[in-house]
A protein has these predicted regions:
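Acidic, gly/ser/pro-rich intrinsically disordered tails
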Residues: 1-4, 14-24, 31-42, 53-59, ...
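Short histidine
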Residues: 27-28, 70
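Flexible glycine-rich surface loops and low-complexity tracts that mediate binding to linear polymers
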Residues: 64-78, 160-173
Length: 219
């Protein structure tokens, strides 16, 4: 599960009802603003279609204004499409110069052992994230300040699960259909790995036959 709290700018409401993830939603095109349109994080907001205060606030939200949204980010296989944000709360009464972009990526894993050196004291590594109970995987980068390099070197193992706190970043080159996508991490955590046994793998019990394989019977 990937949690987000962000100030989001509404571009336009989507007129048609959206059926996604087994539920009916009302939707909107939106973005986490940036100084450049090439650097904004594009989103498709999905608000559960049920009468109530949240739905009213969502439908009354004015185009071109910002609201503080919390919810869950869903990454899909098609990286050319905006990220889906399933809205849990919305607060439209905020200062219009307010900025927030905080994400906790809870179902990520290391997609590589290779740590890349970037400009301005930044390092990066490829990570993957999956949909809940699914084989669908999206690839992106985790960017870190170089002061985290020792920790990353100690923890990295391809396929190892990782939980990340940071903010989302996208960049689109002119003509590209898919953006460069990263989570810029404040920090990350991993589960402690068990010590690998140096034993010979043989059973330690007293019964005999664990290391022997009999011929296959013809039943």
């Amino acid at each position: 599960m990937n949690f987000i709290a962000a100030t989001v700018e509404l571009r336009n409401h989507i007129t048609d009802s959206i059926n996604a993830y087994g539920l009916d939603y009302i939707g909107a095109d939106a973005a986490v603003p940036s100084g450049s349109s090439n650097g904004e994080v594009k989103l498709r907001l999905l608000c559960y279609d049920r009468e109530g205060a949240k739905r009213d606030a969502f439908t009354d939200w004015k185009q071109g204004t910002r609201a503080l949204i919390t919810g869950y980010v869903v990454f899909s296989e098609d990286t050319s499409q905006p990220l889906d944000l399933l809205v849990t709360t919305i607060e439209p009464n905020i200062p219009q110069d307010m900025y927030c972009n905080q994400v906790v990526l809870g179902n990520a894993f290391f997609g590589s052992d290779e740590i890349k050196e970037r400009k301005n004291g930044t390092i990066a590594i490829k990570i993957g994230t999956t949909l809940d109970n699914s084989d669908v995987t999206t690839w992106l980068f985790m960017e870190l300040h170089e002061s985290r390099k020792k920790k990353l070197q100690d923890r990295v193992r391809k396929g190892r699960g990782i939980c990340i706190h940071g903010y989302l970043r996208e960049y689109r080159k002119e003509g590209d259909t898919s953006p460069y996508r990263a989570i810029v991490a404040n920090d990350f955590s991993t589960r402690k790995e068990r010590e690998r046994s140096n034993g010979n793998g043989k059973a330690q019990g007293q019964a005999r036959g664990y290391a022997e394989v009999d011929p296959t019977p013809d039943y």
